[in-house]
Swiss-Prot record:
Transmembrane segments: none annotated. Belongs to the bacterial ribosomal protein bL17 family. Keywords: Ribonucleoprotein, Ribosomal protein. This is Large ribosomal subunit protein bL17. It comes from Bdellovibrio bacteriovorus (strain ATCC 15356 / DSM 50701 / NCIMB 9529 / HD100). Pfam families: Ribosomal_L17 (PF01196).
Length: 181
């Protein structure tokens, strides 16, 4: 079957799961500013995101309702209306870019980053570094009780080893008495 006049990538799914996949990817892109996905999915998601941002430039109630019907996530629609559309107000289109990053090891699918053109990678890495520092501090605080738990596990293992040795000795005694009888 030829693919003439086909407008939709089917992604080997029925319409419901396909819509859910695209809605999820659009929401993730709006929330994080950059997502990693396959090239075909990135191209399809780019269509939807760019149409949504262009619609959001109108800024009226009917546009908000239209976006909510397409993407039922209220936070994502609010981000489109209040953040993304004003940010790209002077840009006539092309709000996203696709950066190919090679092939996925498992199935060799071609992977890509889909990100907004003004995505600030350095700021995101700085935020990530701050979060990792905070998590390191909380991990140190959690290690103190963990040491107690480790000591408790060690004593439990010692008791289990003693019980195992006793059972082994009992088994030998039974075997010896059975051999005598």
């Amino acid at each position: 079957m030829s693919s003439h006049r086909r407008r939709v990538k089917h992604f080997d799914r029925k319409s419901g799961p396909r819509k859910a996949l695209l809605r999820g990817l659009v929401t993730s892109l709006i929330e994080h500013g950059r997502i990693t996905t396959t090239v075909d999915r990135a191209k399809e998601v780019r269509r939807h995101v760019e149409k949504a941002i262009t619609l959001g430039k109108k800024g009226d109630l009917s546009t908000t309702r239209l976006l909510l019907s397409r993407f039922p996530n209220k936070e994502a629609v609010a981000t489109i209306m209040k953040d993304l559309s004003p940010r790209f107000k002077t840009r006539p289109g092309g709000y996203t870019r696709i950066i190919k990053i090679g092939r996925r090891p498992g199935d060799t699918a071609e992977m890509a980053f889909l990100e907004f053109v003004d995505y600030d990678f350095e700021a995101k890495t700085a935020d990530t570094a701050e979060k990792s520092e905070k998590s390191a501090k909380t991990a140190k605080a959690a290690k103190a009780p963990a040491k107690k738990a480790t000591a408790k596990k060690a004593s439990t293992k010692a008791v289990a080893a003693k019980k195992k040795a006793v059972k082994k000795a009992q088994k030998k005694d039974r075997a010896a008495s059975a051999a005598r009888a």
